[in-house]
Curated annotation (Swiss-Prot):
Transmembrane portions of the chain: none
Lineage, top ranks: Bacteria, Pseudomonadati, Pseudomonadota, Gammaproteobacteria, Pseudomonadales
Source superkingdom: Bacteria
Residue ranges that the Swiss-Prot or TrEMBL entry lists as coiled coil: 879-945
Major site of localization recorded for this protein: cytoplasm
Annotated binding of ATP, by residue: K554
A cellular component term, taken from the record's GO annotations: cytosol
Source species: Pseudomonas syringae pv. syringae (strain B728a)
Keyword Kinase attributed: no
Motif ('HIGH' region): 40-50
Entry text on domains: ValRS has two distinct active sites: one for aminoacylation and one for editing. The misactivated threonine is translocated from the active site to the editing site. The C-terminal coiled-coil domain is crucial for aminoacylation activity.
Biological process per Gene Ontology, one example term: valyl-tRNA aminoacylation
Protein name: Valine--tRNA ligase
Length: 948
């Protein structure tokens, strides 16, 4: 084996071997265990969230595969409608071409070209992370089989009365010219205004105060062109007498009614609210309650129309309401119209005041443009009938959320679910399987031929397919079963569905998880007709944030690419990567400065195993995952530790009883075997409960602290002792080999590469059969091998050795200097342990002699420590220069006193505490505590040496 562990050298070659040997495919025996990869965007690249997700899924799949389950981890990518279309449009714009100039077919060809060019990027990255997915089953949400499944799902839902077309208010993205869902809208806190406008009362009506007008407050004066009413609270005494009367709409001249509705807050503004049902979601609900007309005043760009389109609530045209609008505003953009309308109100003496007002401004998460509530024809899924069984499946335990608290988030959304708008005005995606004849009548079918046959339409009837495509989340919602061949009753569908676990971030519980449950339960049935669930467990993890707890985003400049941690990246390339392609180029300088400070030497190459182990160790039940590069470095050291231990074991491991020769187990052998049983049980228990952090912790503790730090040291005196029986030496060699081999199997789901590399060399010595560690059996604890007596004895031994080690450290005595040891207050049990382990203790603690003091006997002046009730004494004569040691301690104490004074002064300075960021203050406080503790220890040491 190489002297040092070089991850690069082994990772790519092992992955190729595993893939070419087909180890990732289901083995065809045992109960099935299935995970579907949440499909990343085909044209994107993996971020830290994906890296985390993959580490967790692969740990589960490798664990279950070793347990003998018939595992399928199926990969695939998502066509990601809006994101991909925007990306390709931007590329074309850079060449001076728009999609409209190209036309639909040619534009789609361009997207497929781009997919072919960049689609392999994701697959390459997934491979680099060591993910053991079955590549032979890779799927894409727009491939032929999935397109058929999407059409089938749409048609069946339509036939069941669960998909309908209707004119409703939607979130309209005026830049992308498509409807988007509530979940794709981000609300931004901004400072805005509240305009107070006068609306004259009609027919000579007066308020209780004798005024002939009402004052309405609005944050969107431009929408007054589409007002259908003014609402007041039914209990508001000021306006009770006016309910049912009319106002004259300024600038337009339309008479609109005064209505009573609980939506109005009498305390807000004047208590009068303008109601624009076609341009505000709350007003739309008021309009439904009062059967108000819907006046749409904007086109798809949110420019004012020459005349309002007036509709009834059922989407039919309303011809009884006059939709005339002032010609002056026709064609104006909504914000320009706002300026001119406010100016017109002011000129007419109808602008009362303009107040500052905090707003929540809705913006599209992709385009960043302000969303316009807009009346348009769209396709909808009726979700309430689908939500009921989906809620029941979680309530009765057919689906479990881990951690359980996420069930509440799921329930609260599902119980208040709105119908789902599934049509998008895009070109890239699954085109809606609906056709229109010339009169506008709509027909739904799997293809045009089926539509014609089903509805007896001859060739003389011209049909035009709907131009819209389906929301990406519709096809993603079918992911667990469409990828297994549904609607055909395939063997794969029967074997691997329902799947076992979905691993996902909490941010897409609504987007994806809920919709998968609803669609799967409606469309996929068991043989007895009962609904299948898509998965039995939803493991929900938090968002991966940076070390300061900030969300990782391009604009913050704190994004890390998991492969840069695996392979390393130099500083200049990292700066270039973080500052190019910014939406806000003005941030580049700040991001560059921050990157140069944080990664002055770039990022070292840590290898996949260290990164994966970091992800697993961070997978707690919390909402957020704070990613810390220090942890990756720590786990890279852990890899080195395992590598060095393996080199020692391979060097010492020959003649370890491979052929059944007699062995004798030492106390240390029995102890480490006992500890191994406990670790096997603990790692298995924690993986069963999805506590990857606790499983990783148990493994780390066993390998680093017990096996490497203690057992390897305890093995040396046995192997060095020329007088030791050959059976005992063979027993220790066998234990070294076999315990490491089992530990490698336990670590394999977390660290696949290093464990495979070492296992290949160790397997012959351990008597292990098979070509790969991947398909070795998962270790199962044997309670009969738990040896409490050996554990107690070794704990005592460790206590004594640590006591001697601490005295050396405190008194500044070199580790190689032989010591005399006196022991006082020694019990019979202590005496037994001393005599049985005399050779071991003298060798490892570097002791010249050990003397048990009889009662009343005194040791020379000594440094002391306690092991239980037993006193450990090391005489100091000739070991230290008392004067020099006190002078050294005085100097160190003086330095620390200065540090305490400096940091304490800083923290008691109000100006510093008020202005410094919380993380800086926390750092300073930690510094102060550390210095104070060190000072206390040095003072004790000083007193002890002074008393010698």
């Amino acid at each position: 084996m190489d002297k040092t562990y070089q991850p690069h050298a082994i990772e790519t070659s092992w992955y190729q071997t595993w893939e070419s040997e087909n180890y990732f495919a289901p083995q065809g025996v045992g109960d099935s265990y299935t995970i579907m990869i949440p499909p990343p965007n085909v044209t994107g690249s993996l971020h830290m969230g994906h890296g985390f997700n993959n580490a967790i899924m692969d740990a589960l799949i490798r664990f279950r595969r070793m347990q003998g389950r018939n595992t399928l981890w199926q990969p695939g990518t998502d066509h990601a409608g809006i994101a991909t279309q925007m990306l390709v449009e931007r590329r074309l714009e850079a060449q001076g071409v728009s999609r409209h100039e190209l036309g639909r077919e040619k534009f789609l060809d361009k997207i497929w070209e781009w997919k072919a060019e960049s689609g392999g990027n994701i697959s390459r990255q997934i491979r680099r992370l060591g993910s053991s997915v079955d590549w032979s089953r890779e799927r894409f949400t727009m491939d032929d089989g999935l397109s058929e499944a999407v059409k089938e799902a749409f048609v069946r839902l339509h036939e069941d009365g669960l998909i309908y077309r209707g004119k409703r208010l939607v979130n309209w993205d005026t830049k992308l010219h498509t409807a988007i869902s509530d979940l794709e809208v981000e609300n931004h806190d901004e400072k805005g205004h509240l305009w107070n406008l006068r609306y004259p009362l009609a027919d000579g009506a007066k308020t209780a105060e004798g005024l002939d007008y009402l004052i309405v407050a609005t944050t969107r004066p431009e929408t007054m062109l589409g007002d259908a009413a003014v609402a007041v609270n039914p209990e508001d005494e000021r306006y009770k007498a006016l309910i049912g009367k009319f106002v004259e709409l300024p600038l337009v001249g339309r008479r609109i009614p005064i209505i009573a509705d609980d939506y109005c807050d009498p305390e807000f503004g004047t208590g009068c609210v303008k109601i624009t049902p076609a341009h505000d979601f709350n007003d739309y609900e008021v309009g439904k309650r009062h059967n108000l007309p819907l006046l749409n005043i904007f086109d798809k760009n949110a420019n004012v129309l020459p005349a309002a389109q007036v509709f009834n609530l059922d989407g039919t045209l309303n011809e009884s309401v006059d939709g005339s609008l002032p010609a002056a505003y026709a064609g104006l953009d909504r914000f320009e119209a706002r300026k001119q309308i406010v100016a017109a109100f002011d000129a007419a003496g109808l602008l009362v005041s303009v107040d500052d007002h905090a707003l929540k401004v809705p913006k599209g998460d992709r385009s960043g443009t302000i969303i316009e509530p807009w009346l348009t024809d769209q396709w909808y899924v009726s979700t309430k009938p689908l939500a009921e069984p989906a809620i029941a499946a979680v309530e009765d335990g057919r689906i479990a959320f881990v951690p359980k608290q996420y069930e509440n988030m799921y329930f609260s959304w599902m119980r208040d679910i709105q119908d789902w708008c599934i049509s998008r005005q895009l070109w890239w995606g699954h085109r809606i399987p609906a056709w229109y004849d010339e009169s506008g009548k709509v027909y739904v079918g799997r293809d045009e031929a089926e539509v014609r046959a089903k509805n007896n339409l001859g060739p003389e009837v011209a049909l035009q397919q709907d131009n819209d495509v389906l929301d990406t989340w519709f096809s993603s919602g079918l992911w667990t079963f469409s990828t297994l061949g549904w609607p055909e009753k395939t063997k794969a569908l029967k074997t691997f569905h329902s799947t076992d676990v979905l691993v996902t971030g909490f941010d897409i519980i609504f987007f994806w998880v809920a919709r998968m449950i609803m669609l799967t339960m409606h469309l996929v049935k068991n043989e007895d007709g009962t609904p299948q669930v898509p998965f039995k467990t939803v493991y929900v993890h938090g968002l991966v944030r940076d070390g300061q707890g900030q969300k990782m985003s391009k604009s913050k400049g704190n994004v890390l690419d998991p492969l840069d941690i695996v392979d390393g990246i130099d500083l200049e390339t990292l700066v270039e990567k973080r500052t190019s392609g910014l939406m806000q180029p003005q941030l580049a300088k700040k991001i560059e400065k921050q990157t140069r400070q944080e990664f002055a030497d770039g990022i070292a190459s840590y290898g996949t195993d260290a990164l994966r182990f970091t992800f697993c160790s961070l997978a707690s039940t919390g909402r957020d995952i704070k990613f810390d590069m220090g942890r990756v470095e720590g786990y890279r050291n852990f890899c080195n530790k395992i590598w060095n231990a393996a080199r020692y074991v391979l060097d010492k491991g020959e003649d370890c009883g491979q052929n059944g020769e007699a062995v004798e187990l030492s106390l240390a052998d029995r102890w480490i075997i006992s500890q191994l049983q406990r670790t096997e049980a603990e790692v298995t228990r924690q993986l069963d409960q999805f506590r990857f952090d606790l499983a990783a912790q148990a493994l780390y503790e066993f390998i680093w602290n017990q096996y490497c730090d203690w057992y390897l040291e305890l093995s040396k005196p046995v192997l060095w002792d020329e007088t030791a029986p050959v059976e005992r030496q063979r027993g220790t060699r066998r234990t070294l080999v076999r315990v490491l081999e089992v530990a490698l199997r336990l670590a394999h789901p977390f660290m696949p590469f290093i464990t495979e590399e070492i296992w290949q060399r160790l397997a012959p010595l351990a008597g292990a059969q098979g070509k790969t560690i991947m398909l070795q059996p998962w270790p199962v604890a044997n309670e009969a091998r738990i040896d409490q007596a050996a554990e107690d004895d070794i704990e005592w031994l460790k206590g004594l050795m640590l006591a001697v080690r601490n005295i050396r450290g405190e008194m500044n005595i070199g580790p190689g200097k032989p010591l005399q040891l006196f022991l006082k207050n020694v019990s019979a049990e202590d005496q037994r342990r001393l005599s049985e382990n005399d050779y071991l203790l003298k060798k490892l603690a570097k002791l010249e002699s050990m003397t048990v003091l009889t009662e009343g006997a005194e040791a020379p002046l000594s440094a002391t420590a306690l092991v239980g009730d037993m006193e450990v004494l090391v005489p100091m004569a000739g070991l230290i220069d008392k004067g020099a040691e006190l002078a050294r301690l005085d100097k160190e104490i003086q330095r620390l006193q200065g540090e305490v004074q400096r940091v304490g002064g800083k923290l008691s300075n109000a100006a510093f505490v008020d202005k410094a960021p919380p993380e800086v203050i926390a750092k300073e406080r930690a510094k102060l505590t550390e210095a104070e503790q060190a000072l206390g220890k040095l003072a004790e040491q000083h007193a002890r040496i002074a008393s010698l």
